Amino acid sequence: MADSIEDAVSRAMSESPERNFRETVDLAINLRDLDLADPNNRVDESIVLPSGTGQDTHIVVFAEGETALRAEDVADDVLDSDDLEDLGDDDNAAKDLADETDFFIAEADLMQDIGRYLGTVLGPRGKMPTPLQPDDDVVETVNRMKNTVQVRSGERRTFHTRVGAEDMDADAIADNVDVILRRLFTDLEKGPQNIDTVYVKTTMGPAVEVPA
């Protein structure tokens, strides 16, 4: 399967007209034979890509004390309990933060307050924070999340996720695609039989089918 994926990625990249901006490479997945009205059948996975996403991933950490200090070196923003309360009083600021942030990470002790102040904003967007347990290293967690994508179908049979950027090697992007498909094969009720078609494409380029 790896060779066929790499061939599809190579075609998608070579057939994409040159643009004056750096294009992403995206994966489009079409499901079949699933009742997506049932939340148990929906895809909702955070997947670490072995070759990275090829793009900046915006990460915000909710933390206090030493954890907050360590997070400042690696996260895009670090917010404490006072910031959290302020966001709870400013719905527009909370929505803006949610929209511009890819992933949130939070100390476990702050999760209850996050639910209280931001639950109605982050929950529907599927962006509730990843809890940081006392033994977790915040630096390692942030660095791992920088290479993570959220693969989510919702109620749609067709959904997309980022798998790289046009200046990455085709084999590196193929490795990312392979990891995503293998996770889906494991998670879906009927495995590969629940996947109708898979396509890879650059932002503005043609879609190229990935052979099953």
Curated annotation (Swiss-Prot):
<keyword id="KW-0810">Translation regulation</keyword>
<dbReference type="GO" id="GO:0003735">
    <property type="term" value="F:structural constituent of ribosome"/>
</dbReference>
<dbReference type="InterPro" id="IPR028364">
    <property type="entry name" value="Ribosomal_uL1/biogenesis"/>
</dbReference>
<dbReference type="GO" id="GO:0015934">
    <property type="term" value="C:large ribosomal subunit"/>
</dbReference>
<keyword id="KW-0678">Repressor</keyword>
<dbReference type="GO" id="GO:0000049">
    <property type="term" value="F:tRNA binding"/>
</dbReference>
<keyword id="KW-0820">tRNA-binding</keyword>
<dbReference type="InterPro" id="IPR002143">
    <property type="entry name" value="Ribosomal_uL1"/>
</dbReference>
<keyword id="KW-0687">Ribonucleoprotein</keyword>
<keyword id="KW-0694">RNA-binding</keyword>
<comment type="function">
    <text>Binds directly to 23S rRNA. Probably involved in E site tRNA release.</text>
</comment>
<dbReference type="InterPro" id="IPR023673">
    <property type="entry name" value="Ribosomal_uL1_CS"/>
</dbReference>
<comment type="function">
    <text>Protein L1 is also a translational repressor protein, it controls the translation of its operon by binding to its mRNA.</text>
</comment>
<comment type="similarity">
    <text>Belongs to the universal ribosomal protein uL1 family.</text>
</comment>
<dbReference type="GO" id="GO:0019843">
    <property type="term" value="F:rRNA binding"/>
</dbReference>
<dbReference type="GO" id="GO:0006417">
    <property type="term" value="P:regulation of translation"/>
</dbReference>
<comment type="subunit">
    <text>Part of the 50S ribosomal subunit.</text>
</comment>
<dbReference type="Pfam" id="PF00687">
    <property type="entry name" value="Ribosomal_L1"/>
</dbReference>
<keyword id="KW-0689">Ribosomal protein</keyword>
<dbReference type="InterPro" id="IPR023674">
    <property type="entry name" value="Ribosomal_uL1-like"/>
</dbReference>
<dbReference type="GO" id="GO:0006412">
    <property type="term" value="P:translation"/>
</dbReference>
<dbReference type="InterPro" id="IPR016095">
    <property type="entry name" value="Ribosomal_uL1_3-a/b-sand"/>
</dbReference>
<dbReference type="InterPro" id="IPR023669">
    <property type="entry name" value="Ribosomal_uL1_arc"/>
</dbReference>
<protein>
    <recommendedName>
        <fullName>Large ribosomal subunit protein uL1</fullName>
    </recommendedName>
</protein>
<keyword id="KW-0699">rRNA-binding</keyword>
